[in-house]
Amino acid sequence: MATGKEIVVSGIRSTGFLHLGNYFGAIRNYIRMQEDYNCYFFVADWHSLTTHPDPKDLRGNVYRVLAENIASGLDPEKVALYAQSDIPEIAELYLLLNMLAYKGELEKVPTFKDKVRLQPQNVNAGLLTYPVLMSADILVHRAVKVPVGKDQEQHLEMARNFAQRFNARYGELFPEPVAFNFGDNLVRIQSLDGTGKMSKSENEMATLYLNDTDELIRKKIMKAKTDSGPAEPGAPMPDSIANLFTLMQLVTAPEVVKSFENAYQDQTIRYGDMKKQLAEDMVNFMAPIREKAQALQQDPAYLQNILRTGAEKARASAAQTLQAARKLIGINYY
């Protein structure tokens, strides 16, 4: 990895399918970041174990997520792409940070309380200490910036707390990581049924997945929620309509978007025509990503090499951190 650049760390879920919200909310910004930062991007397979995924699915999930990220534009030559479980130093730092974490603060984390409410039959220690493992993911590379969503901001605050506690007790080692601010580049994609963020939607027909077929993309967009049109010129635009225009602005020629915006303002818009235009433009945008990801998944040897090379880069960084941490704590005996 290049020296002199700020270090960025971010995790990629190994469960579920990547969708358009992931692409425009995170992956597209990762692609920009890889030019200017030392980036460590990992597939969070250890984190997924809190939900006890079927072992026979885990490898395929990791390969698929890796392939979709590379197909979207992440360059393994510019970033470290690795599986979390390939870096044993993360597990060791997780253990050390647990000695600086307190039961009371972990139980107060909103995401933990949500999990307890939603899955009371599986309140395991991994769920409770999830923020500690996330902190180890970040601090093991001494990252200074972390792209996180709103639901992860408290976890990042805890990572700063653990860094402060370690530094105060043993000596300066960890920078206090801050959230990466994407500014105007942050795009929030809503579900097609107008019920909230695409990432939170439980309606598969309201979510555009990166592996959707052309026909499924068209079908989903044609079913997207609309209304009867503006009641008067200049009327406020409902969220569901604004979301369609947001999607158009991302994949459609500016002059075409402008024509539909004008039609909306003068109350002549035909949503069916707008959806057909958006559907074709979305197919043209998503199909190359899907096709490249599918091709990559047919070459497991290539993906294995990416993971192996990424792990080597990540371990080189992590080993230095753990060596320094052990020395400061006093557990270097020879």
Feature-to-residue mapping (PLM):
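N-terminal Rossmann-like or analogous alpha/beta NTP/dinucleotide-binding catalytic cores
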Residues: A2-A136, Q294
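Short, solvent-exposed beta-strand edge segments and adjacent coil->beta transition regions
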Residues: T15, A143, N203-M205
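Short connector loops/turns at beta-strand edges and beta->alpha or beta->beta junctions
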Residues: W46, S135-L139, G194, A253
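Short helix-capping/linker segments at secondary-structure and domain boundaries
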Residues: K103-E107, V140-P147, T252-F260, R290
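Internal, conserved structured core segments that host functional sites
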Residues: D114-F166, Y170, Q190
